[in-house]
Amino acid sequence: RLPQSIRTQEILLQNGTVQDCRGCSYEACRHFAEGGRCFYGGAVTEQVLPAVQQADAVLLLCPNYNDAVSANMTAFFNRLTNLAVVRELWDKYVWAVVVSGFSGSDLVARQVLGAMCLNKAAILPPRFCLLQTANDPGAAAEAENVGTKLDVFAKSIVDTLLP
């Protein structure tokens, strides 16, 4: 739904290889970050943080796990501190798609807002979050008016990034 003029890169956090931050001191975190790495290494240091640093925008796909983002998404939010201590993120746009079984989409959206905007200072544009209810696997893609919702959501991304 996004035009080819918007280059995308998909990074999966679902394979369980994302190690959460264990809370280095600010000085230690900054020391490693200045060298372009994190003490805990792995996919976050090698793929995720460099991709975020190069990106103009980040689109997060957030399934609702018991009214919360996934453990890997939480680890991403926490490990993003390693980039934020050496480079301001105030010029990065963030959008999210939240899919919930019955309820709690608003809680997940608030976690994205808190982690990415309030804590990391990224930009969350108006209507940054698309919320969808889906009770069964694959049901989100078949939901009523989902195509129209996605078109409107994609247009808002394009209008923001390519004014």
Residue ranges and their predicted role:
Residues 117-121, 133-136, 157-162:
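Short, highly charged low-complexity linear segments
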Residues 96, 135-138:
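Short beta-alpha connecting loops at secondary-structure transitions
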Residues 89-131:
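Short, glycine-/small-residue-rich phosphate/pyrophosphate-handling segment
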Residues 1-85, 138-163:
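N-terminal beta1-alpha1-beta2 submodule of the flavodoxin-like/Rossmannoid cofactor-binding fold
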Residues 13-15, 128-135:
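Short beta->alpha junction loops
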